[in-house]
Each structure stands twice: as structure tokens, then as C-alpha cells.
Regions:
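Active-site beta3 strand of CheY-like receiver
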Residues: 57-62, 67
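C-terminal output helix
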Residues: 98, 116-125
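Short amphipathic alpha-helix used as the core "switch/output" element in two-component signaling
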Residues: 51, 73-85
Length: 151
């Protein structure tokens, strides 16, 4: 008898956090990400998102740079403190080389300029997931371990 294994969808269990103070941008993100069946939580400000990060685990976050209450870099810092493996993309319409470098130095995966294309979002999700898998994969030791039970 031949058994076929069920193939899991790539998007299965992928949770994405989006924070942007513009409702139309949030809706665009949700629409783009739901095409791939990603599970998306969207918030209009950083504090609302940070409350959720304690309750759930996200794979990727897209955070607007200019937000009310706290800016995107502050949200990035707090997200990384709560979950160092979370991949964060800073999104902005006001990109400068200095702010790009600052975001990367603070641990951002990338800096996405508005307006963006659907393909850019998908590429960043894929890149973030690949990076998370590399981080989670235990690195093999250069020196082999001695066999257990032999003295």
C-alpha cells in the first residue's frame, strides 16, 4: 500500500504583525498577506501591538516608522526585547540612509519604502522565514561528542 503524506501549506501557522497608523495601509497589508493565507494581526499604534506580543508569537512584523505614541524604532526595540527571534521590517515613506542604517543596526531585517509592491512583501516574508529557520537550526559542533555510556 502506498501512503501519501499531506503536504503542508508554506503559509500554515505563519503569524504576521502589522503596525501602521494609516487604516488604508493596514488594509493593503492584510489583503496582500491573506492572499498567501498568512495569519495577520494589525494595529494602529505601537502600544496596542506590544500588548499582543506578550500573548502571541509572531514570525514577522511590518512596523511603520512614524507612529503615534511611539515611533517605529522604539517599537522595534521593544519587540526585539520581547522576542529576539522576531524578524522586523521597518516601513516608511520618509527613508534616509541614516534611518535605514539605524534600523538595521537595531536588528531590523530590512527597511521597506512606501509605496511598496506585493512582490516586495512576499520576498521579505520569505527572507524573514529563511532567516528564522537558520537561527532555530542548532549549529553542529566542530568537535564530535564522545559516545554516551562509554567510560
Amino acid at each position: 500500500m502506498i501512503k501519501f503524506r499531506k503536504r503542508c501549506k508554506v503559509s500554515e501557522n505563519i503569524k504576521i504583525l502589522v503596525v501602521d497608523d494609516e487604516p488604508t495601509v493596514l488594509e493593503s497589508f492584510k489583503m496582500i498577506l491573506k492572499i498567501k493565507d498568512y495569519d495577520v494581526d494589525a494595529f494602529l499604534d505601537g502600544p496596542s501591538a506590544l500588548e499582543k506580543i506578550e500573548k502571541g508569537k509572531y514570525d514577522i512584523a511590518f512596523i511603520d516608522m512614524k507612529l503615534p505614541k511611539m515611533d517605529g524604532l522604539e517599537v522595534l526595540k521593544k519587540l526585539k526585547e520581547a522576542d529576539s527571534e522576531l524578524e522586523v521590517v521597518i516601513v516608511t515613506a520618509y527613508a534616509t540612509d541614516a534611518s535605514h542604517a539605524n534600523a538595521i543596526n537595531m536588528g531590523a531585517l530590512e527597511y521597506l519604502r512606501k509605496p511598496f509592491l506585493m512582490e516586495e512583501i512576499y520576498e521579505l516574508v520569505d527572507r524573514g522565514l529563511r532567516r528564522r529557520r537558520r537561527v532555530k537550526t542548532p549549529k553542529e559542533s566542530a568537535t564530535p561528542k564522545p559516545p554516551e555510556g562509554i567510560h
